[in-house]
């Protein structure tokens, strides 16, 4: 299953889907992914908005790998976002 998320970094606002595969009987939660030993999180079907650009250009990407150290805020996206 996947969860739609909003991610804020110093330079970008990212909206996309984090896929959380089942491991055994327990479904992985977003916090499990963020606290794992992996240093990157995969985000699919995402839109990146440049936060510091005057015209706030938005880019669409099928897939990005985001370094966890660059995340300022991450949360499930709201329906209206």
Predicted regions mapped to residue ranges:
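Conserved RNA-binding domains used in RNP assembly and mRNA/RNA metabolism
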Residues: 1-81
